[in-house]
Amino acid sequence: KQHLFDKKHTQFLSKDLRNPNAVLEISEEVPAPDLIVANAGVTLHGRAGSFDVDKKANLYYLLCGGVIDLIESYLPEMRERRSGRIVIISSIGALTPMPKSSIYSSAKAGIFAYGRSIHQELKKDNIDVTVSLPGYVRTAAHKRAGLDHLERQIPSWMWITAQQAVR
């Protein structure tokens, strides 16, 4: 599924980042942008050790490997022009235990660590990196992933809407 929108020099491109080839397609189709917002937010629900190998690999690549590959594909151009901004959307799950969401949590921890590392590294290239760790965002994703019990277990004051998360 792809949407390419160009209005006032802004492009939005949607690809299936579970597929490493899609990441390459993006960097071939769109020159290095001024701003990259890397956000992947899906999960699997289940006990550790019970995940289907392919589903686990696809999810981990989407949440961590695909995000890193996308950013890495643009870094040479951003470094060459000595400018850019990268926003990586991780999760509070990178810092807190998430029973029955271990793949999600570990992948979000991976991009959190990656983002903090490249933040230090890219300062000298005038490229700004921000890693966001939103808390519990109320979306249909929890229900689809079989995690609707979270709404009962986590106090309501800890939840935010998607609109609040993007502010």
How would you label these PLM feature ranges?
Residues R47-L59:
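Substrate-binding pocket helix/loop in short-chain dehydrogenase/reductase
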Residues I71, A107:
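Active-site helix of classical SDR
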Residues S91:
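Residue(s) in the substrate-gating loop at a strand-loop-helix junction
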Residues N39-L44:
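Conserved NAD(P)H cofactor-binding loop of Rossmann-fold oxidoreductase domains
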Residues F5-N19:
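Rossmann-fold cofactor-recognition segment
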Residues G49, M98-S102:
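Active-site loop immediately N-terminal to the catalytic Tyr-X3-Lys motif
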Residues Q120-R167:
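SDR active-site lid
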